[in-house]
Amino acid sequence: MSVKKQLERLSELGAYYHKNGWMPGTAGNLSIRIPEESGFWVSGSGLDKDLLNKRNFLYVDLESGKPVDSKNVKATKGLKPSAETSIHRAVYRALDEVGCGLHVHTLESNLICANTSKNEPIALFELPAIEILKAYGIWEENPKVYVPIIYNFPNVQDISDCLEKYLKEYRPHVPFCIIEKHGITVWGKDAVQANRNLEATDFILKYMTSWKSFSYSGEPRKLSVSDVLEQDRREIFSVEFPVYPATFY
């Protein structure tokens, strides 16, 4: 598929996500990377996602993180990259196989809290072992699957640095991360897979946050990961990130 066609597809997804309430206002951004090129395309800053077109995407050099000219599509004059461009860049720099990144601000992703901080900016928590995990290619029975949640630094570059370091050192279980009180970044080999992963992620987060309202014991059901031992974490991740029970706003 040509670059123009891929950008048109991202524009369609932007309108769909805006309608779903995943990209309210001008929040969020979408990107693709072409394997044979040295950069990636990302939606510009301050744009209504229901009105995107192929000229609303900037071509960004992967190494420098700066916008550069492209022979494929000429971006709208004066278009600027979002600060969150660095999040997409972090994923592409860490994971060679990724060809699409979707950064959205869903309500459910903002309700999940792991009490991260500047001193402990990454926590891990366990996802529920439900059927939809198969969308990520996880087929084990009752798998132990963890997702990173990252502190919402005021400077987005600090978020990106944290994410890139994590992805490079510890192979993620699932193709997404949560930025606390901010949103989620989801990725895939192309826009089709990334969109599929985002739909699965949205379902999982809706399921998780529903536990606060529906309980079989009379108390809100929260993620029970406090029993994950330090040794278990070292075996799975070889890393000393804290594992917290998730709480909900």
From Swiss-Prot:
Stored InterPro entries: Aldolase_II/adducin_N, Aldolase_II/adducin_N_sf, MethylthioRu-1-P_deHdtase_MtnB
UniProt superkingdom: Bacteria
Pathway: Amino-acid biosynthesis; L-methionine biosynthesis via salvage pathway; L-methionine from S-methyl-5-thio-alpha-D-ribose 1-phosphate: step 2/6
Name this protein carries in UniProt: Methylthioribulose-1-phosphate dehydratase
GO MF term set: methylthioribulose 1-phosphate dehydratase activity; zinc ion binding
Keywords assigned: Amino-acid biosynthesis, Lyase, Metal-binding, Methionine biosynthesis, Zinc
UniProt xrefs under Pfam families: Aldolase_II (PF00596)
Cofactor(s) demanded: Zn(2+)
Entry's family note: Belongs to the aldolase class II family. MtnB subfamily.
One annotated Gene Ontology cellular component of this protein: cytoplasm
Residues reported to bind Zn(2+): H103, H105
Alphabetical GO biological process terms: L-methionine salvage from methylthioadenosine
Role played: Catalyzes the dehydration of methylthioribulose-1-phosphate (MTRu-1-P) into 2,3-diketo-5-methylthiopentyl-1-phosphate (DK-MTP-1-P).
Its EC number(s): 4.2.1.109
Species of origin: Leptospira interrogans serogroup Icterohaemorrhagiae serovar copenhageni (strain Fiocruz L1-130)
CC cofactor note: Binds 1 zinc ion per subunit.
Reaction catalysis annotation: 5-(methylsulfanyl)-D-ribulose 1-phosphate = 5-methylsulfanyl-2,3-dioxopentyl phosphate + H2O
